[in-house]
């Protein structure tokens, strides 16, 4: 089998990270906008064709502080730390308005008609902007602190247009946009007001309105007011959580319901009359909180924005109809995955990736389809809770149906794929280590339909072998506290564990600079491999031979013989610690990645680095392969994935086709030149991009056509010949740039400058100078041509001047006779 030397990859970058701004979504739920530091991603959420529509780079390179999509999805408004408000039109893909605001802003709101935008500043001021026309319609002052919440009220053709605002001091104000004045000032909160909503209440006399306000003082206030009488506090409800968002809903019977979200990452529905909690989401194990709620589809569904930049979709309308007390999350979108420590291909079709990240939850994401012309963004993430602290590593069986995870909570968990729900369930939990579990290993041979054992390594410097119970009809999680054996393995932390292909031995790699080989059946030490100068990060068995690879902080990978337990090859080339290594291509090659952000593909027989894949800017922690190296996925500390696909055969075929075509074209060029077909020879030489052959074509064409050129008065000047001049006259912009570049190079040499000058003359005769100057890069090329042209002109002018001496001498000689 040929060596794999060429890979093509696609990058999957975090879509939401490094910004305090809350993501925003259009009312129909199809367009999502998320900040990434000083950039913004606008994403099409249409199932099956998810893609980034626009990527906005902030010219001032300042972090995005607030952004808001208009409900109709036509405009995106955003503010950066540079205090610039910008309005981006999605259809044209351009910023149509930009204006300076008086202070930094962290809150924006758009009205239901997508015509008005409210901007709240840290100086307590509020401006209302006409989105389409880009001018300020209102300016309000009166708050004593930073504006922390805004909410429009008003419908198309309505006479009542209001804006409610809250600040960090707990003050709430209601502004009349028609009369341009403050209607009410409310001071019942003792902390920042983060949620506001207004709803109309049926009244016989005149429309009455209810105002809802929620703050970080763990309470929500319900007010009643109209356009004439004072605002009346109806009730204050303690909600036992810091409120980051709140609003009104209606159930199927028209009953008014209040939702709140915030602390403890809990979203809850509250009866507005009794104040009792009707339903709520489960509290996650990880310490998170909800930073925003994004209602879509007329409040029937909502995106919950978590502090780890995960978006969870809930169907409020359906949840209100059922009798369950818990609100179920229907799907999740991962803004980023943080630091990916380890990963494996899982699922019945191995089309998913299980991730161990800096989170207690096991994350599983879909693998993008690289076979199509454009892969749909794999934004969905399945989140499985079970551990109470961060995951260190994981392993999976070859069929992808069983996963083992290792955590800092001193436990390991085995997960089983449920064919009915198409989800993974906790199968067994292993408790027994006295420190963090750092590595796990499952058998490579699953003969009875389930893995029979689990290996774990821990920071307590021990390794344990556990029995995995036989599956039963019961779905109860089995807690295993007694291991089959425990061995003191190393003197320092154990970083990796690998099981041999035949499940007879296993290897451990440690910071103590050694790799140890153990008998899997009885746990006895068989060999100690010590040749590295620094701690080991990874160890991997070869599936097709008795070989073992270890990677180390000494920047090397070593290949060991399992017969002699000696080093066969030392692979050097990384500039930093090598984090992962694995055999591919039936042991002919080895792949490694390191803290230098590079992936290297090695020839095991020669020790030569065949290919270096550069797609990361940070330390590579995770690397996984499938189909013996046909597919590779790598992930770094920034949460960036690179999916690599082997295209060696395709590239070889393309190179062969390219070489074949080049031979045919070169032969055609020779035929054209021998026939004197200078036009086709010129065009083909341009296509081949052979400077010397192009020069020879022009030179020979000039030599053969000089005798035929007629420069009598009244006739058009011909530079080469009429056909070739005509061919130059119809060149496109790209061809003109290429030809001018060749003229620039020829013009630097006294032997070739004549052809260069004639070619330039021909171009200037047949092409408009103004249009030539508009071609990108043309002016720069001309600037490089001018100095040498002036030098050639001076030299020719001096020769002409010197020729006058000969004329003078001849005249004087005639006088002697």
From Swiss-Prot:
Ranges of the WD repeats in the UniProt entry: 59-100, 102-139, 142-187, 191-233, 238-280, 386-425, 432-476, 489-528, 531-572, 573-614, 616-654, 664-705
Protein's cellular compartments: Nucleus, Nucleolus
Primary subcellular site in the record, as a coarse category: nucleus
Gene Ontology annotations for the cellular component aspect, listed alphabetically: 90S preribosome; nucleolus; nucleoplasm; Pwp2p-containing subcomplex of 90S preribosome; small-subunit processome
Domain of life: Eukaryota
SUPFAM superfamilies linked: WD40 repeat-like
InterPro entries membership: G-protein_beta_WD-40_rep, Utp13_C, WD40/YVTN_repeat-like_dom_sf, WD40_repeat_CS, WD40_repeat_dom_sf, WD40_rpt
Subunit structure and binding partners: Interacts with snoRNA U3. Interacts with MPP10. Component of the ribosomal small subunit (SSU) processome composed of at least 40 protein subunits and snoRNA U3.
Function field: Involved in nucleolar processing of pre-18S ribosomal RNA.
Name of the molecule in the record: U3 small nucleolar RNA-associated protein 13
Species for this entry: Saccharomyces cerevisiae (strain ATCC 204508 / S288c) (Baker's yeast)
Gene label: UTP13
């Amino acid at each position: 089998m040929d060596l794999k030397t060429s890979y093509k990859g696609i990058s999957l970058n975090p879509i939401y990270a490094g910004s305090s701004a809350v993501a925003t979504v259009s009312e129909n739920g199809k367009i999502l906008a998320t900040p990434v530091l000083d950039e913004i991603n606008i994403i099409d959420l249409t199932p099956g064709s998810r893609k980034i529509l626009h990527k906005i780079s902030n010219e001032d390179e300042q972090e995005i502080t607030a952004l808001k999509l208009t409900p109709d999805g036509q405009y995106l408004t955003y503010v950066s730390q540079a205090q610039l408000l910008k309005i981006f039109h999605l259809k044209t893909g351009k910023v149509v308005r930009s204006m300076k605001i008086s202070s930094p802003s962290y809150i924006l709101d758009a009205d239901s008609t997508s015509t008005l935008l409210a901007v709240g500043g840290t100086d307590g001021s509020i401006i209302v902007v006409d989105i389409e026309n880009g001018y300020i319609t209102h300016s309000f002052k009166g708050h004593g602190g930073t504006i922390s919440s805004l909410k429009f009220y008003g419908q198309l053709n309505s006479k009542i247009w209001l804006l409610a605002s809250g600040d960090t001091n707990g003050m709430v104000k209601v502004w009349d946009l028609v009369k341009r004045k403050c209607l009410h000032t409310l001071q019942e909160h003792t902390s920042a007001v983060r949620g506001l909503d207004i709803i109309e209440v049926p009244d016989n006399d005149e429309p009455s309105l209810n105002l809802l306000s929620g703050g970080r003082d763990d309470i929500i206030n319900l007010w009643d007011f109209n356009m004439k009488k004072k605002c009346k506090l109806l009730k204050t409800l303690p909600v036992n959580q810091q409120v980051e968002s709140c609003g009104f809903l209606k159930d199927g019977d028209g009953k008014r319901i209040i939702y709140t979200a915030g602390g403890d990452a809990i979203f809850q529905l509250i009866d507005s009359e009794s104040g009792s909690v009707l339903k709520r989401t489960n509290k996650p194990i990880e310490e998170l909180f909800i930073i925003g709620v994004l209602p879509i589809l007329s409040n029937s569904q909502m995106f919950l924005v978590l502090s780890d930049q995960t978006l969870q979709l809930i169907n409020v309308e359906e949840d209100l109809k059922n009798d369950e007390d818990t609100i179920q999350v229907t799907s999740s979108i991962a803004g980023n995955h943080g630091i990916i420590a380890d990963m494996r291909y899982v699922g019945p079709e191995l089309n998913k990736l299980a991730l161990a990240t800096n989170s207690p939850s096991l994350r599983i994401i879909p693998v993008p389809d690289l076979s199509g012309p454009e892969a749909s963004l794999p934004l969905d993430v399945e989140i499985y809770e079970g551990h109470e602290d961060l995951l260190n590593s994981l392993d999976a069986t070859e069929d992808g149906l069983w996963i083992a995870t290792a955590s800092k909570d001193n436990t390991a968990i085995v997960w089983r794929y449920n064919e009915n729900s198409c989800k993974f369930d906790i199968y067994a939990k292993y408790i027994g280590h006295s420190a963090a579990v750092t590595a796990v290993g499952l058998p490579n041979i699953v003969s009875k339909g389930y893995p029979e054992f689990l290996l774990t390594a821990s920071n307590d410097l021990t390794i344990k072998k556990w029995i995995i119970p036989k599956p039963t009809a019961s779905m109860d999680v089995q807690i295993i506290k007694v291991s089959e054996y425990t061995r003191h393995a190393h003197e320092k932390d154990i970083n990796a564990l690998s099981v041999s292909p035949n499940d007879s031995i296993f290897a451990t790699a440690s910071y103590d600079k050694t790799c140890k080989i153990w008998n899997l059946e009885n746990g006895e030490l068989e060999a100690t491999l010590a040749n590295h100068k620094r701690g080991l990060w990874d160890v991997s068995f070869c599936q097709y031979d008795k070989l073992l690879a270890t990677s180390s902080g000494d920047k090397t990978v070593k290949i060991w013989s399992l017969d002699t337990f000696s080093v066969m090859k030392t692979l050097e080339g990384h500039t930093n610690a090598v984090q992962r290594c694995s055999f591919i291509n039936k042991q002919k090659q080895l792949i490694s990645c390191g803290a230098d952000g590079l992936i290297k593909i090695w020839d095991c027989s020669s020790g030569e680095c065949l290919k270096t894949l550069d797609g990361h800017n940070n330390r590579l922690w995770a690397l996984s392969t499938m189909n013996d190296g046909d597919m590779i996925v790598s992930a770094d500390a920034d949460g960036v994935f690179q999916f690599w696909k082997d295209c060696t055969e395709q590239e070889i075929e393309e190179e062969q086709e390219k070489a074949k075509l080049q031979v045919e074209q070169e032969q055609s060029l020779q035929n054209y030149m021998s026939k004197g077909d200078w036009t086709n020879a010129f065009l083909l030489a341009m296509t081949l991009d052979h400077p010397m052959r192009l020069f020879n074509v022009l030179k020979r064409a000039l030599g053969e056509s000089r005798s035929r050129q007629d420069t009598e008065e009244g006739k058009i000047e011909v530079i080469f010949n009429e056909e070739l001049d005509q061919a130059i006259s119809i060149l496109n912009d790209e061809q003109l740039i290429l030809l001018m570049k060749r003229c620039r190079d020829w013009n630097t040499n006294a032997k070739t400058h004549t052809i260069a000058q004639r070619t330039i003359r021909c171009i200037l005769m047949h092409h408009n100078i103004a249009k030539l100057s508009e071609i990108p890069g043309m002016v720069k090329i001309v600037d490089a041509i001018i100095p040498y042209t002036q030098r050639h002109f001076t030299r020719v002018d001096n020769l002409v001047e010197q020729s006058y001496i000969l004329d003078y001498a001849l005249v004087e000689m005639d006088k002697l006779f």
